[in-house]
């Protein structure tokens, strides 16, 4: 973990696991690694950025237990665990920087590849992790924030319990099989810290 000033506030950066198991890795790190465990009392928030895959629908209860454990790392107030999710692939969130779109499905490898190719049509040098391409895309973030909010709001008609970041809403999103993103909530939160 590195702790550094990022222009907003102090930020702790956890290593992204190279395989699936983000939630269990975080729990394990806070249980066993002194560099995380020793900072638990001063940890305000833990953010999980992840893609919701089709096979994640049945994993909510397991993840919920880990979320509850992580919240309890600090008492009064508990650690806030924020789930920042995008259906199936980050390229969907990135496409929202350029146009409003709600694909009916983003569940197959082919769906994800189509989304990636659509992004490459707009940003020809895009590759996952390419800093130059990401910076170009990020310049359009206000549009993505607005569009991501519209995508989420459209799910109210499909049964989304609330737009508020609640456990009930997050459970529904992880199990709904619909196209969505909540990444815009991180940006809205960070921008609120500036004011």
Name each model feature, range by range.
Residues 2-14, 27-47, 52-195:
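C-terminal accessory helical subdomains adjacent to catalytic cores in phosphodiester-
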